[in-house]
Structures are given as structure tokens and as C-alpha cells.
Amino acid sequence: MAKIKRIITTLVRLLVLGAALSATIVMVTSHDSAEVLNLSFDAKYTNARAFVYFAITNAIASGYSFIALFLSFSTPLWHLVFLLDVFMTLLLTSSISVALAIADVGKKGNSHAGWLPVCGQVPEFCDHVTGALIAGFSAAVLYLVLLLFSIHAVLNPKP
């Protein structure tokens, strides 16, 4: 049974690592430019603090997932890993929430505030952001699954 737990945990951590790393890479490489009324502007992820937060959070989650791959269930650090899994789940959930809110404003605009949608002018940027958000959402869901599995492992430590 312990071997099955280790295999499942390793598999889910690898999936999280792939999803979070993909979200980071796709978000960091998102860039497009447009010209409107003879004015040129660049759209990149650094223009929105929410996208920067999203990229940094996913980078942290992928780094932590990589390190956690090498820890054993039998080490005393496993309870710390459990607490860090909770923290990473919350961190990823907050980053996907804030990035989705900004992406929604970018796509639809906000008529009450007078903000126009920008995805019509910079579609490549919006496509990159959408891809990053899909990968980030996958990472958050996978971390939730990993957290539930970790809760089960902590509450039922039987081999």
C-alpha cells in the first residue's frame, strides 16, 4: 500500500510540475503589439501585476513540486510537506482567481468603468494568456487532488 501511495503522489506531483511550469512559460512568453490610431502599444504579461503574480506563483509551485518529489513519506518532514501542500493550493487558487479576473476585463472590458476590451487588438497575447490560465487552472485542480491525497496519507499513516 505504501508503494501505491508513493506512485500516486509522484505521478500527481509530476503532473502538477508540468502544468505549473507550462503555465509559467506560456505566461512569461506572452507578448503582442498593436497599432491603434497611429499609436503603437505592446501587450505583455508585465503590464498587469496579476499576471506577474500568476507567473511567479506557478514558478514557485513548480519548484516546490520538484523538490517534494524527492521526499519520502517516512521522513519527519512529511508533515511539513503537507502544510506546504495546503499553502501551495491556496497560493495557486488565489493566483488563478486574480489572473482570471484581469483576463476577463481584457476580453470583455468594463462598460461601467469605461474600459474597452483589448483582445480584438492583441489576439496573440490573449491566446497565450488563455493557454496559461488553462494550464494554471489544471495545476490548481491537481494540487487540490494532491492535497486531498496528502490529508488521507496523514490521517491514515498505515503502510
Swiss-Prot record:
Spans through the membrane: 7-27, 51-73, 87-107, 131-151
Glycosylation sites: N38
Cytoplasmic side: 1-6, 74-86, 152-159
Residue spans, topological domain Extracellular: 28-50, 108-130
Keyword Transport: no
Annotated keywords: Cell membrane, Glycoprotein, Membrane, Transmembrane, Transmembrane helix
Membrane topology reported for the UniProt record: Multi-pass membrane protein
Location in the cell: Cell membrane
A Pfam family: CASP_dom
Gene Ontology, cellular component aspect: plasma membrane
Similarity comment: Belongs to the Casparian strip membrane proteins (CASP) family.
Subunit: Homodimer and heterodimers.
Protein name per UniProt: CASP-like protein 1C1
UniProt organism field: Vitis vinifera (Grape)
